[in-house]
């Protein structure tokens, strides 16, 4: 993780000095690749340092960190750019990244064993692990790829991401074209879901750890159905009903925020082998963003394919979009139910 953050910080500094578009694009891509080292490293650390009954609380707060980081970036970097110019935006981000790499290197330790502590999630009579258990990482990672429960969770998360990015990408347009909201009002309503999403993600682990004894399946079902209900309120009630749409976005944001934590990684980490939790997150993450990408294509095709011109005005029929978005949320719940009793291998 230190390596990824350090290289990303150095690339940001280089971007500030770049004058070539091709070099800028190459550095941007390399930066993204090194940034991808962060999530898996964090999840591995969480799985090694915290027990099953407390991991969810920390995982939930960690899951919200990228949203908080983005918000701070928009504020801090935008302020730097407005005063000093765009190059200094990269310089500022690079310096913060270097500081972060130093902090991670100093305080982020590989495992309890590396600091002389006994491993967590190991029976009391077995506080030491055999060499084969601690070194056969490749076998454990291959096992993740063949675990049906991980694959089903990946599908569930992919369908959840379809409904998530449907609202994020098309929600403002939908409110304008279908319900007649102004751009400002539509943007405000959709922004409610983003704020509530952060709250839902931050407290998702606390909910499962404190209220359900570390079980994720029950709250995943509750908030999955909450997501379905929110989309039905948002899509199936015609006309301008500001407070109803606002309530729908509150429910949607809270539901998606919790599901991002559970379906988007935590449930897979819980059932994956301890030394392959990063691989489990990777499988779910890839499937999730494939779903998000397909959503943009499918939604665009369905919206454009059911557009008509009446008296020189573009009119959209969102019937099929409604089915697609709500259906995806329902399928996400359906697949999550398939792994109701899944246990760690």
Where are these regions (language model features)?
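Helix-loop-helix hairpin linking two adjacent transmembrane segments in secondary transporters
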Residues: 62-113
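Helix-breaking motifs and short loop linkers at transmembrane-helix boundaries and internal kinks
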Residues: 11, 17-22, 180, 237-239
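Cytoplasmic helix-loop-helix junction between adjacent transmembrane helices
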Residues: 27-68
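A membrane-interface helix-boundary motif in multi-pass transporters
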Residues: 82-94, 215-218, 301-329
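Extracytoplasmic gate region of multi-pass secondary transporters
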Residues: 147-204, 260, 295-299
């Amino acid at each position: 993780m230190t390596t990824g953050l350090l290289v990303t910080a150095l690339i940001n500094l280089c971007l500030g000095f770049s004058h070539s578009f091709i070099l800028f694009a190459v550095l941007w891509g390399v930066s993204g690749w090194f940034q991808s080292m962060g999530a898996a490293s964090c999840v591995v650390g969480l799985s090694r340092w915290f027990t099953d009954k407390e991991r969810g609380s920390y995982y939930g707060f960690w899951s919200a960190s990228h949203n908080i980081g983005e918000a701070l970036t928009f504020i801090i970097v935008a302020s730097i750019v407005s005063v000093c110019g765009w190059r200094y935006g990269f310089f500022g981000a690079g310096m913060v990244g270097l500081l972060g790499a130093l902090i991670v290197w100093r305080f982020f330790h590989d495992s309890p064993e590396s600091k002389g502590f006994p491993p967590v999630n190991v029976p009391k009579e077995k506080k030491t692990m055999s060499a084969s258990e601690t070194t056969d990482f490749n076998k454990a990672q291959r096992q993740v790829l063949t675990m049906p429960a991980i694959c089903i969770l990946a599908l569930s998360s992919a369908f959840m991401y379809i409904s998530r990015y449907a609202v994020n990408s098309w929600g403002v347009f939908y409110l304008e074209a279908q319900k007649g909201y102004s751009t400002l009002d539509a943007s405000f309503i959709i922004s409610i879901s983003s704020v509530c999403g952060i709250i839902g993600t931050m407290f998702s682990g606390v909910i499962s750890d404190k209220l359900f004894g570390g079980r994720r399946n029950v709250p995943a079902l509750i908030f999955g159905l909450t997501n379905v209900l929110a989309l039905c309120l948002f899509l199936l009630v015609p006309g301008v009903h500001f407070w109803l749409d606002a309530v729908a976005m509150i429910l949607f944001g809270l539901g998606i925020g919790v599901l991002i934590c559970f379906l988007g990684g935590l449930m897979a980490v819980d059932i994956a082998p301890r030394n392959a939790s990063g691989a489990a997150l990777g499988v779910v993450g890839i499937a999730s963003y494939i779903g998000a990408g397909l959503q943009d294509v499918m939604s665009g095709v369905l919206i454009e394919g059911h557009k008509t011109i009446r008296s020189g005005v573009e009119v959209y029929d969102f019937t099929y979009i409604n089915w697609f978005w709500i259906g995806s949320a329902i399928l996400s719940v359906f697949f999550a139910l398939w792994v109701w009793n899944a246990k760690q291998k």
